[in-house]
Design a protein with these regions (language model features):
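Short alpha-helix plus adjacent loop in nuclease-associated cores
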Residues: 97-115
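N-terminal accessory targeting/assembly segments
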Residues: 1-100
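Short alpha-helical scaffolding segments that buttress acidic/His motifs in well-ordered protein cores
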Residues: 102, 137-138
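Amphipathic alpha-helical coiled-coil segments
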Residues: 113-120, 124-127
Length: 146
């Protein structure tokens, strides 16, 4: 079983439902080895949580040998990339976790196609690298291999 570290944020005095996130992680096939809840005064545009908090998560992740960090909020593509630069584990936000769960449990062809479409729509703004470079260079989709 994959080891998950859960990260949630208390914003504007509203406490997160960490138990729900734990259940989602279990449904995805993992085991929760730790959790961090941060009180946020404001959302950091670069990391969502603060940089110091991200470094704290990285240290906690290494101590617990967690392979995945699940954030109980939606991360923008740049926030995910920035967190990946600090935290030595796979970064998953709430939406991706839920899409992964649906993917595992879809049985009909229609269901599988709908989940795949949702996953691709989620991943599209997060694509960086050679494929995007080639698309801009040539102007066609035929050179992109995902």
């Amino acid at each position: 079983m994959e080891k998950f570290l859960l990260v949630a944020a208390e914003e504007k005095g509203i406490s997160p439902d960490i138990d729900e996130l734990k259940q989602l992680a279990r449904t995805a096939g993992g085991v929760c080895v730790g959790e961090k809840i941060f009180k946020l005064k404001r959302i950091n545009p670069a990391y969502y949580i603060g940089r110091g908090q991200a470094e704290e998560v990285a240290k906690f992740c290494e101590e617990l040998n967690a392979k995945t960090v699940i954030f109980d909020f939606d991360l923008k593509p740049n926030q995910t990339r920035n967190l990946e630069g600090i935290i030595p584990a796979k970064i998953i936000d709430r939406t991706r976790l839920i899409l992964d769960i649906f993917s595992r449990h879809a049985h009909s062809e229609d269901g599988k196609n709908q989940v795949e479409l949702a996953q691709l729509e989620y991943l599209l703004p997060r694509l960086t690298g050679k494929g995007v470079f080639l698309m801009q260079q040539v102007g066609g989709l035929s050179l992109i291999h995902i």
